[in-house]
Every structure is written in structure tokens, then in C-alpha cells.
Amino acid sequence: AARAMLQHGIFNDALPLKMTYITPCYRYEKPQSGRYREFYQFGVEMFGAPSPAADAEIICLATTLFERLGISNLSLEINSIGCPTCRKNYQAALKNYFSAYKNELCETCVKRLEKNPMRIVDCKNSDCQKISQNAPNIIDFLCEDCRKHFDDVKKYLDNSNIEYKINPKIVRGLDYYTKTVFEFVAKDDAQRGLVCGGGGRYDG
């Protein structure tokens, strides 16, 4: 979305800019249950909105969308993954923690240990998940600015009567996210844990 806006000069318009899109996408990863190689992605973007109110607005919009589609058996989970400064200390703490379990991690996470240990927290391998249960949480490493931003997001959601739970294990799979991240997770037994939607802030 950002590339399209730059290409067509849309950033010349007044900020914040809001847009929506639907497009076919492809995953460069091994297909899994509920995660196909090709899929359609519907999304919304808000550019030029640094306020935590913008994060809450996107989450409220997603909540309303699911409600109008009649999809109610979902749990909204939120987290903050901070800024690059926060994550530097967090990554170091994770590397120190997971190094003690290196022989028990899956092959992919052994590689992640050196490149991006945050991704180990998001691994779907059952052994890695068990090890991650006692791993350090990013919330404990947030700087003052990121902590206030997250507190404000929660206040906006509370004022909008949006139910949520904080899940410190949400890191999302894309490295450009900063501060707020969220996921809508299926609660029914057949699809428990399936992420039906999600996103987050990215301050480029």
C-alpha cells in the first residue's frame, strides 16, 4: 500500500490518509493448516497518524467488521513490541534465554536465535512453544514513550467497550512492525488458535 501511494503521489494529499485494499497474496513459506500458499488479503491502512488513537481506531474498525460479518467467536489479543531501542535490549535477553535451550529448538529457531530471536516466541512448533512460556516478555523492556503509547491504546479500547486480552507472545511475522500489534484468534475447538486477522503499527 505504501509503495502504491508513493508511486502515484498520493502522499501529497493532506494527512492522515486512510485507504483500503483487497488483493491476492502469496506466502514464501511451507503451507500449513489454514495457511495456504495463495490467499486473498483485505486490509486497511492509515498513514501519517502517530497517535495511539489511530491504533485503536483500526482495531475498532476490525472488530466492527467481524461483527457485521457475523463472526463472533473470536478473541482480540494485543501487545506492544516497542521501538528499535526497546527491542535491542529485549533481543539480547531472548538470545541469552534461548541459548540455554538451543539443542531443544526446532531447526528454524536455531537459525532465528542468531538473526532474530523474537521470532522464536512466535514459532508454532510445540517444543518451541513450551520453551517460550517462560521467556522474557517485551512489555518488561518497553521504554517510557512506548509504554505510554500502549497504555493510551488500552484506554481508547476500554472507552470504546472493546474486549481484549494482552498477549505478550504476539510479535507478528513481519519485522517492520513497531509498538502496537494485534490479532483476532478463533476460540472454537475446531479452529482454536487460528489467526483470522491481525496487524499493527509500522513507523517507517
Predicted region positions:
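TRNA-recognition modules of translation machinery and tRNA-sensing kinases, especially anticodon-binding
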Residues: A1-G204
